[in-house]
Amino acid sequence: VATVDCSDYPKPACRMEYMPLCGSDNKTYGNKCNFCNAVVDSNGTLTLSHFGKC
């Protein structure tokens, strides 16, 4: 099972680095920062499906 540590999020701004992650909502997030901010916004209901594009 793929996991990402989002304990130091949310962050006010994310860098533009591109390292895609696929969320449990079947949406591709551009990088860990964007994904983790979305996890926080979802109150933890969003999880990582896998690394890479959906």
From Swiss-Prot:
Keywords of the record: Disulfide bond, Glycoprotein, Protease inhibitor, Repeat, Secreted, Serine protease inhibitor
Residues of this chain annotated as glycosylated in UniProt: 43
Subcellular location: Secreted
InterPro entries tied to this protein: Bifunctional_prot_inhibitor, Kazal_dom, Kazal_dom_sf, Prot_inh_Kazal-m
Alphabetized CDD domains for the sequence: KAZAL_FS (cd00104)
Sequence ranges assigned to domain Kazal-like in this UniProt record: 4-54
Disulfide linkage: 6-36, 14-33, 22-54
Site entry (Reactive bond 3), positions: 16-17
GO cellular component terms, semicolon-separated: extracellular region
Organism superkingdom: Eukaryota
SMART domains tied to this protein: KAZAL
Gene3D superfamilies in the cross-refs: 3.30.60.30
Single GO MF descriptor: serine-type endopeptidase inhibitor activity
Entry domain remark: Avian ovomucoid consists of three homologous, tandem Kazal family inhibitory domains.
Name of the protein in its database record: Ovomucoid
Organism from which the protein derives: Cereopsis novaehollandiae (Cape Barren goose)
